[in-house]
Amino acid sequence: MSELKVAALRALKLMDLTTLNDNDTDAKVIQLCHDAKSPVGNTAAICIYPRFIPIAKKTLREQGTPEIRIATVTNFPHGNDDIEIAVAETKAAVAYGADEVDVVFPYRALIAGNEQVGFDLVKQCKAACGDKVLLKVIIETGELKQEALIKKASQICIEAGADFIKTSTGKVPVNATPEYARMMLEVIRDMGVAKTVGFKPAGGVRTAEDAQQYLAMADEILGGDWADSRHYRFGASSLLTNLLNTLEVTDQKADPAAY
């Protein structure tokens, strides 16, 4: 198997296969669940809006893949600084049956100089998740832009108890980039938290070559056995089709407009 195919198979099993569109329907989410069960292995998770969790849970169970995790989003996509709302949404997501919650960090507050609200929001959302539900925190790297802010946001999230730090919502002009990924992975390394904290690039990872580049970077910074499904995810939709093409199990074309 070529190096690219090896990377493609590895990436597929690390995917949070995502649909977060305003026009999502039960039918689209059911199809997403079907797609997550691929001929060469399952994606790690699906990522959907909270209202679709019950239909997704039912579909995954009925198709014999209850182990595919269900991730959802809160405080999404704007990352407002109202802690009560973020916590209430997170509690509701857990009550719906989410296995993982991707919450948006109040990045505009950090840009304005307020570090405390982000810390408090993440800490309280993690408390709402408890030990069983993973909390991934989206810092919106493409809006923070500066290395100092990206590293500070990553540090705050980790100190407040985040299980993962995630680049982007996919709803702003600039999402995951290798440059931003490196900054965040270096924070995980430098804080000595690689055992407990994972990383998720999201938006803009569209091809097997992209995934290979991101995984090689993780291997370089945190070691070749670090990037398993507890420590690494790709947030993507169109990536799956490209990975399956690379692995020669489909000839579908990816949607060029997809996340």
Swiss-Prot record:
GO terms for molecular function: deoxyribose-phosphate aldolase activity. Keywords: Cytoplasm, Lyase, Schiff base. Signal peptide: none annotated. It catalyses: 2-deoxy-D-ribose 5-phosphate = D-glyceraldehyde 3-phosphate + acetaldehyde. This is Deoxyribose-phosphate aldolase. It is found in: Cytoplasm. It comes from the Bacteria. Its EC number is 4.1.2.4. The keyword Cytoplasm applies. GO terms for biological process: 2-deoxyribose 1-phosphate catabolic process; carbohydrate catabolic process; deoxyribonucleotide catabolic process. GO terms for cellular component: cytoplasm. The active site is at residues 102, 166, 200. Belongs to the DeoC/FbaB aldolase family. DeoC type 2 subfamily. It comes from Vibrio cholerae serotype O1 (strain ATCC 39315 / El Tor Inaba N16961). InterPro entries: Aldolase_TIM, DeoC, DeoC/FbaB/LacD_aldolase, DeoC_typeII. It is an enzyme of class 4 (lyase). Coiled coil: none annotated. Pathway: Carbohydrate degradation; 2-deoxy-D-ribose 1-phosphate degradation; D-glyceraldehyde 3-phosphate and acetaldehyde from 2-deoxy-alpha-D-ribose 1-phosphate: step 2/2. Catalyzes a reversible aldol reaction between acetaldehyde and D-glyceraldehyde 3-phosphate to generate 2-deoxy-D-ribose 5-phosphate. PANTHER family: DEOXYRIBOSE-PHOSPHATE ALDOLASE.
